[in-house]
């Protein structure tokens, strides 16, 4: 088994009302429950971002569209990708990038 990073991209962002936010959180909670012991770290959504450049300068925003992350444990990349198929961000117009991590 190995760890894989789910990088969430896009989606419609934060819900506009407390009721809608509660519904979104319930959807994520339900999906996390289906992952069971494979869920290593539920992660966090991303907020503000700055990019640091090689010359030391920085700019606001990342430009990548990443909106959050989670970490799962799976047998291989294919199994991790299968786990990502139920992610709520997919139904919201977003995508999940699945990255294998390397133990160092």
Task: Give the location of each predicted region.
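Conserved, structured core segments of small domains
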Residues: 1-104
């Amino acid at each position: 088994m190995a760890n894989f990073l789910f990088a969430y991209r896009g989606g419609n962002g934060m819900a506009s009302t407390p009721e809608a936010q509660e519904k979104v959180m319930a959807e994520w909670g339900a999906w996390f429950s289906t992952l069971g012991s494979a869920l290593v770290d539920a992660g966090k959504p991303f907020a503000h971002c700055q990019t640091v450049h090689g010359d030391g300068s920085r700019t606001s925003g990342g430009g990548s569209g990443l909106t959050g992350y989670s970490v799962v444990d799976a047998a291989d990349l294919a199994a991790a990708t299968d786990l990502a198929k139920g992610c709520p961000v997919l139904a919201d117009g977003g995508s999940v990038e699945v990255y294998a991590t390397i133990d160092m």
